A protein has these predicted regions:
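Conserved alpha-helical scaffold segments that buttress catalytic/binding sites
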Residues: 2-6, 12-256
Length: 256
């Protein structure tokens, strides 16, 4: 029997702002409570640090008001597979506006924590490789999904024929451009397959997981733009409805 080596990797470094729709609301609340308007980008233009505080306050209130209206609109429309083209266009337009609004508010922090994340994942990557090289089986006990980058890439570095099964209601297949919130823990599977080509995998020179060898099991809450990434890559998704319909055993057979 192969020895199991347990790797403790508890972290929440991938978190940027909390949750999907909640993330946008958090940014709004942060903006409302902020007295330093030059921390933000308003209407696409950086505010001068020495600009008039009264003018800044008016700009902030105006922007927040529009942003609040946008959030209210978002709660009135939800993406459904049976939407007609007009309804889908309306949803995508609102989602696009929300993405722009969030990134405008938080543009200076778009890739926050990258240095710490990369340092952590590189250590985890090397540890995973060492465990496998020693003939042991790595069992990772980790924090948020960002730890999957170091462990999965370390594994495929030692076994180039590996596939990856992602048990999650989320696909974690976002990219920087498609992520609404900027939560980096929504990118790991895209990084592991090199769909998201970013510095999150700079410590690894390949190989990456083949799209055809990547399977998502339990998907039920996938962003519309993220769905576009999944479909573009050709990654297989078994939804919660598929599990109910076919059963866990059959889904596992199909996944393998």
């Amino acid at each position: 029997m192969k020895k199991v080596s347990i790797i403790s990797a508890c972290t929440d470094l991938g978190l940027k702002i909390d949750g999907a729709e909640l993330g946008a609301q958090v940014l709004t609340n942060d903006l409302k409570s902020s007295n330093i308007s030059h921390n933000y980008v308003l209407k696409g233009n950086k505010k001068d640090e020495e600009s008039n505080s009264s003018s800044d306050s008016n700009d902030i209130n105006s922007f927040v008001s529009k942003f609040d209206d946008l959030l209210l609109d978002m709660h009135e429309i939800h993406f459904e597979e049976n939407m007609n083209d007009e309804e889908k266009d309306a949803y995508y337009t609102k989602m696009h506006n929300l993405v722009l609004a969030v990134k405008a508010l938080d543009s200076k922090n778009e890739k926050r924590n990258l240095e710490g994340i990369n340092e952590f994942n590189e250590r985890l990557y090397n540890t995973t490789r060492k465990v496998i090289q020693d003939g042991e089986f790595p069992l990772l006990v980790g924090g948020d999904h960002i730890v999957a980058i170091g462990s999965s890439l370390g594994s495929i570095k030692e076994n180039k024929n590996m596939g990856i099964i992602w048990f999650d209601s989320h696909a974690d297949f976002n990219t920087y451009p498609t992520s609404v919130t900027g939560n980096l823990h929504g990118l790991p599977l895209a990084v592991a397959t090199h769909y998201e080509k970013s510095i999150l995998s700079d410590f690894h020179d390949g190989p990456f997981y083949n799209f055809k060898n990547a399977v998502i099991v339990g998907g039920r809450d996938i962003d519309p733009w993220e769905w576009g990434n999944v479909l573009d890559a050709g990654v297989t998704v078994f939804s919660t409805e598929d599990i109910k319909k076919y059963g866990v055993e059959e889904i596992c057979k199909k996944a393998f």
